[in-house]
Amino acid sequence: FQKMGNQCGFLFYTQAWNTSKIDPVTGFVNLFDTRYETREKSKTFFGKFDAIRYNVEKDWFEFAFDYSNFTSKAEGSRTNWTLCTYGERIETFRDEKQNSNWVTRKINLTDKFKELFAKYNIDIQADLKEAIAQQDSAEFFKGLLHLLKLTLQMRNSETGTNVDYMQSPVADAKGNFYNSDTCNESLPQNADANGAYNIARKGLVIIDKIKRSDDLKKIDLKISNKEWLQFAQEKPYLNE
């Protein structure tokens, strides 16, 4: 022990999959592909949502869905969610007025959705899922997919500043939306901290595997994506 220096221990490698861009409260991750391809594919995509509606009381739009209708990546974890256009996002785009350099701007999601629907004469009080299915404009679907992408964008960073925060699009059991700028001290206070927080939580999974193993020589410390989502969503460590 005299030759070991001041510190000794073990390092474990763990996969970084969905550790920085995950809601640390609900365990929600974005598994959608929001790239525009064709109008018909866009109609099919939005047709898979259970409901698309405007919540008058809350003044936001809601996209209710079951991941099972879109992808198999959520298999074995929670699949039913409701996305809400709550809060602001930082949009990154090329500005022609600045030699097409990348710039950022903060946008209010709900206002942008209202503008898009108004442009195409869509009544937000009506059945939005049906109204979307009736659209034939490629530009409309490009705009809608872009806004959905921004809704799903949890990490928001502003070029040339220290602004770098997390904003979840789904509410927790109490109706609150995780935001790293306003959350309590027990949760990550910025986007980088969220990555470290969730890597540490994967460490808890590894420790649990070691504790439960009957043969440490044959233990498998690999964490599957399914295992990680289940752990992040169920948070079993809170009951210990």
Task: Describe the predicted segments one by one.
Residues 1-240:
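Positively charged, helix-rich recognition surfaces that bind polyanionic ligands
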